[in-house]
Amino acid sequence: MGSALAEEHLGRPPRVAVLNIGAEEIKGNDLVKRCAEMLSQTDAINFVGYIEGNQILHDVADVIVCDGFVGNVCLKASEGTAQLFIEKIKTSIMASTIKGWIARKLFSRLFNELKTLNPPDQYNGASLLGLRGIVIKSHGSADVSAIVNALGEAVHEVKRQVPSRISDRLEAVLLERHY
């Protein structure tokens, strides 16, 4: 399902990986191993193998498969790490010492670049997949701009008929497994 949605955005088959505690096939629980085995047996998905937690942000995969609990923990841990990193740098920059002055000079340009890299209001909302319609779940701290962008994503998914494309892809994968 994530592969079909990502392909709509990327314009190419996405790289799909399963989140695991290691890259070796012997690692992981039964659910993770079965999932990887199923994905590796279909030509309809560009499966690239396992991905570890420390690789999530390193452009190893376009779609990362995991259960909802693990995915939510990863998302919130990433958010928390980024927030802590920014707070620490801001504290250093705001210090009225020579160290603070140097930090301001070094990091001000970097901060401006980072602000434009992934603005949270532009990428607000997660598509709930596997439904017959479109549902976009927004972040609890979303502002008006973020909600507008989430609505734009919903309109895009309606125009591209994403639920039926996902259904078609899923049907192809299931048929492939039975023949």
Name each model-derived stretch.
Residues 1-53, 62:
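Glycine-rich phosphate/diphosphate-binding loop of Rossmann-like nucleotide-binding domains
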Residues 20-25, 51-55, 67-71, 140-143:
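Glycine-rich beta-alpha junction loops
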Residues 60-64, 68-179:
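Glycine-rich phosphate/nucleotide-binding loop
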